[in-house]
Swiss-Prot record:
Binds 2 Zn(2+) ions per monomer. One of its GO terms (cellular component) is cytoplasm. It comes from the Bacteria. CDD domains: DnaJ, DnaJ_C, DnaJ_zf. GO terms for biological process: chaperone cofactor-dependent protein refolding; DNA replication; protein refolding; response to heat. Keywords: Chaperone, Cytoplasm, DNA replication, Metal-binding, Repeat, Stress response, Zinc, Zinc-finger. The keyword RNA-binding does not apply. This is Chaperone protein DnaJ. The J domain is necessary and sufficient to stimulate DnaK ATPase activity. Zinc center 1 plays an important role in the autonomous, DnaK-independent chaperone activity of DnaJ. Zinc center 2 is essential for interaction with DnaK and for DnaJ activity. Zn(2+) 1 binds at C148, C151, C205, C208. SUPFAM superfamilies: Chaperone J-domain (SSF46565), DnaJ/Hsp40 cysteine-rich domain (SSF57938), HSP40/DnaJ peptide-binding domain (SSF49493). Zn(2+) 2 binds at C165, C168, C191, C194.
Amino acid sequence: MNNTEFYDRLGVSKDASQDEIKKAYRRMSKKYHPDINKETGAEEKYKEVQEAYETLSDTQKRAAYDQYGAAGANGGFGGFDGGGFGGFDGGGFGGFEDIFSSFFGGGGMRNPNAPRQGDDLQYRVNLSFEEAIFGAEKEVSYNRESSCHTCSGSGAKPGTSPVTCQKCHGSGVINVDTQTPLGTMRRQVTCDVCQGSGQEIKEKCPTCHGTGHEKKTHKVSVKIPAGVETGQQIRLTGQGEAGFNGGPYGDLFVIINVLPSQQFERNGSTIYYTLKISFVQAALGDTIDIPTVHGAVEMSIPAGTQTGKTFRLRGKGAPKLRGGGQGDQHVTVNIVTPTKLNDAQKEALHAFAEASGDKMVHPKKKGFFDKVKDALDVD
């Protein structure tokens, strides 16, 4: 995958601003949404758009993607600030102390017997437009590595216990001598018998076969705050995969994906709505019920309103996640020109044009009564 494919999916350039990326995402997401687009391949396109936006809307992931491609955005390279997915600890490459300790058995090597936290997981949850505005509580179900229910995570057959590894004597590491041009180099490596645990399992658990873990379907309730947007994450501590050597469970990161609305668009706490009105309503003015996520609101359209005029409904937008308060709804007017007119409507518009002093390039054709008047020479 080249380093511009995600930009191509959204139809933006590589130097696009976050606002341009967000607008492009809303447009492409609505175009390919399975509930709207029934064409073959639309659902796959929709997923590709989601994947691209998840990366490009995050400044750190975007920087990694621009430099390394998709592998960098997914945490495949070091240098990120921890808390990534798949159990990476933020330091993708070790320091010099790790290099020297690997050759000389120095004290910089991590203790393989130490308790280690389990891997983090991620789960994408879809929210309706309204759920994102008002908040929701969702039950999510996913598979994770859990502590084995038969052996309680020991890996040993019930009634037996692990014993100290005879090869590493419980240290979890062994010394290996290597011949080099500089002489014999000694380095420490993880014990190949106990895999660093320091213990041997003579009789393995029949359920987990000695791993201490088993795949289970796990359910958890997620409280989603009002005002969330696509790409935001909710961290559930201890809901990831089981730890090692008695370590704690990892975390679950719930990634928000807000489905598009049929009538509204949103940017932050501001909601946008396009109001279609007739020429008569625009010219004479009217009072119209405007839909909002909070219910219909009566709004006055002043006489002489032009296409593109925007009105603001204060407090009818989305909640502000930071700082509190409520956003606004912007209502943009779109005057609809009729495409089919009957004779009476045409007569009325011609009369209006004459009264307004408008010169028609193609004057109206005379009607039946006009022809009768001409024949009788009646004014």
